[in-house]
Amino acid sequence: MTKVKICGITTVEDALMAIEAGADALGFVFYDKSPRNIIPERAAEIIGSLPPFIHVVGLFVHAHLDFVNATADRCRLDIVQLHGDESREFCSRVNRRVIKAFRVKDITSLDRMEEYRVAGYLLDAYSPKAFGGTGITFNWDTAVVAKKFGPIILAGGLTPDNVTEAIGHVSPYGVDVSSGVESAPGVKDPAKVREFIKRAKGL
């Protein structure tokens, strides 16, 4: 069954709602240019209220290594997701398992993937204006090719309306959604979250 990550969590209410709906992982954005940015202190409070067996992922963009590792410790992150141009060496120095994100323009966007030895690879649509959360899709055929590198997490413009088609096309390890289940940036819509997870898991 496809794993589901709900990203851009900013409140304990949204976190618990997503878990109740069946989310496997929650994502917290530690990037001050994102409308879903959350400070480590607040994220730690939310994470401290979660039940067991939920994976907690921290998303970082071009952050200093010390900040990444300190935040991972403070917030008890299970996984660090690096969404910028972080090097293979940088990834190896993170003290958590790493998901490396790649923003896809075309098939050449995959050229750097085999440099990395990480736990998973997240594929998102390229935007010159933002690192994720754009609501833009990309050619899913590219994601099919990328599966040769390891576990693929499909992101970029996923919604309750297209997630079934996306999974049928790619058969990814997991899917990642943020803006596609929101009523406003950083505010999750319970009905959309429930429907997305239901369709992603074929329930």
From Swiss-Prot:
Enzyme Commission no: 5.3.1.24
Family: Belongs to the TrpF family.
GO BP terms, alphabetized: L-tryptophan biosynthetic process
Source organism of this protein record: Geotalea uraniireducens (strain Rf4) (Geobacter uraniireducens)
MF-aspect GO terms: phosphoribosylanthranilate isomerase activity
Superkingdom per UniProt: Bacteria
Keyword field contains Isomerase: yes
Protein name in UniProt: N-(5'-phosphoribosyl)anthranilate isomerase
Keywords: Amino-acid biosynthesis, Aromatic amino acid biosynthesis, Isomerase, Tryptophan biosynthesis
Catalytic activity: N-(5-phospho-beta-D-ribosyl)anthranilate = 1-(2-carboxyphenylamino)-1-deoxy-D-ribulose 5-phosphate
Listed InterPro entries: Aldolase_TIM, PRAI_dom, RibuloseP-bd_barrel, TrpF_fam
Cited SUPFAM superfamilies: Ribulose-phoshate binding barrel
Pathway named in the protein's UniProt entry: Amino-acid biosynthesis; L-tryptophan biosynthesis; L-tryptophan from chorismate: step 3/5
